[in-house]
Amino acid sequence: MAQEQTKRTGGGDEDDTPGGDGAAGQERREKLAEDTDDLLDEIDDVLEENAEDFVRAYVQKGGQ
């Protein structure tokens, strides 16, 4: 399955405006969700076309 990684940065001037970035945060989450969905769709397409080769390559690289 897909995993989402989050990078947190230390404090700064941006923390001085409480609630000011709520809309920007929501927009960023929506963009990340859209990008993730696109990536998963691409993976699904590859697996539909060539699942056997994908599994064979995965096992050769040490996957279980």
Swiss-Prot record:
Region spans: ARC ATPase binding: 21-58
Recorded superkingdom: Bacteria
GO-annotated biological processes: modification-dependent protein catabolic process; proteasomal protein catabolic process; protein pupylation
Disordered, as annotated region: 1-38
UniProt KW keywords: Coiled coil, Isopeptide bond, Ubl conjugation pathway
Domain writeup: The N-terminal unstructured half of Pup provides a signal required to initiate unfolding and degradation by the proteasome but is not needed for pupylation, while the C-terminal helical half of Pup interacts with ARC to target proteins to the proteasome.
The name this protein goes by in its record: Prokaryotic ubiquitin-like protein Pup
Lineage: Bacteria, Bacillati, Actinomycetota, Actinomycetes, Mycobacteriales
Gene that encodes it: pup
